Amino acid sequence: MKQSILLFLLILLISGCSEKEIDPSFSLQEETSSITLASAANSQTVISFTSTREWGANTSSEWLLISPTSGKAGTYQLALTASSKNDSKDSRTAIVNLVSAGLTQSLTVTQSAADYVELEQTTYYTEAQGGSLQVKFTTNLSGDKLVIYSTANWLTQPADSRTEQGYVVNLTALPNEDERERTANLYFCKTNGLEEELLNSVTIIQEGTNTSTSTDYSTDKTVRILQRATEGNGLPIVLMGDGFLDTEIEDGTYDEVMNKAMENLFTEEPLKSLRNYFNIYSVTAVSRSNRFDGYNTAFGCQMAGGMSTLITGNDENVIDYIQCIENIDLYETLAVVVLNSPSYAGTTYFGYYNENNQVTELAIAYCPIIYDLENESFRQVLVHEAVGHGFAKLEDEYSYEENGKIPSSEISSVKMLQSYGWAQNVDFTQDENTILWSSFLKDSRYTSESIGIYEGACTYMSGVYRPTEDSMMNTNTCGFNAPSRKAIYDMVMKRGENRETSYEEFTVFDKQNPSESQTFSRNSASTSSSRQFARPHFVGKSVHK
């Protein structure tokens, strides 16, 4: 027995001595003095190295992902991946540290700067009679790699009008004989002769012949009741318009737009079958001007233009007009502001606090009359913004390549929304048993909807998941998916009947009121397929009744 113990101790001693004799070292199998990644998200390089001891790898840069991050002695392939696009003008660097038993070897990784076109301004206005204008920009592309073209035949680019040295595009706008303004986009694309990549765009708005100012404000703040609720508490929706002249109110244009907006809001399930729960109002807003370039409009709306679909407005003015309605509950109100413009844009704001610092359901959705009153894009974007974001507080389900992996700060922000019962259509786990829509994954009644766990949402490519490949909260071209329909249904019952619902209650309702799977193709030249939509904004400010 003593001999066995002595033998065991001898083996331990020899083993300990052997480990001490092995010094930590790294042997890199290729040149690492210059490790460069392309500017695109998910750009990757792999380096091979051998370590004589256990090792770990780390970096303090959020944009660089390392895999694997540790290992035992041996030869490894270390993948270095850019989690997001470098859309700045300058390259960026990260330090990767290989660590083993007190030894640290550092590697410098550089991500190249993206090709860019930077505009002096993103929106230009021109008068109805037409004329010339200059679009100024800077770029790091050579002349043969950059193409510039317009989406409208009324905007022409004379031969030899582009100045290479000065980065100026000279344009001519033909006269606009219509009363309404019209919009065109100028696209700046990188080309390799076969494919084009959109880098930036300019929005050009030409005024119509009816550009003037209002003189009669007598109908301002007039309230029109469009619908009284026949079920529940009567959830308030308030419609109002920005950029409408007194003459457009007098001739019935304003009321026509408000009526159409109301009908559009109830074109998708489940709100289509829950319409009786809503009180709907229209408040007349007389704007001094029908232009959004700094002239006075009732709500001071401005559109960012260019690559952005962002709309900003004066929410205090919107709230003032809401409170023209007698006995309305401001904190339960969905306000929809329709802009008197054909531009493709839309933005929603929520996260307003009451006097007790409690978050409320108040939301303000801004949406132009996209293209025209009967255009499908107007309906789709209005439903996406006002119903999806404004009423149900759903998240966006689309993603952009340049955004890469969702950062921890964004995850925290979305989880905060979920603590209020919002953002029920996205999650951060792939666990079928715990994901927010796990019940649908196990329900054979929803097999035809292909509900699953699809990576990419909240504008980010990875680290966040959505329920379906496409939906109203993705491309806007089809209805709400089942988890979103449930979120909307639950919201109506919670606020309209002061009660919680069960999964089975919803499925019974849902099957009795099936959602039509509408799919509409879009013109390839449409700006909607290439321009980023602004995410909803959590305002985080107090408002008082």
Name these PLM-found stretches.
Residues 14-34, 101-108, 112-118, 201, ...:
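Bacterial Sec-dependent N-terminal signal peptides
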Residues 34, 46-79, 141-170:
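Surface-exposed binding patches on compact interaction domains or structured appendages
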Residues 80, 88-102, 169, 180-192:
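A short beta-strand micro-motif common to beta-rich folds, especially ectodomain repeats
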Residues 19-22, 29-58, 120-147:
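Solvent-exposed, low-complexity, repeat-rich "mucin-like" stalks and linkers
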Residues 210-327, 503-542:
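Propeptide-to-catalytic entry region of secreted or membrane-anchored zinc metalloproteases
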Residues 291-293, 320-330, 338-366:
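Catalytic zinc-binding patch centered on the HExxH motif and its immediate surroundings
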Residues 360-386:
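Short pre-active-site segment immediately N-terminal to the catalytic Zn-binding motif
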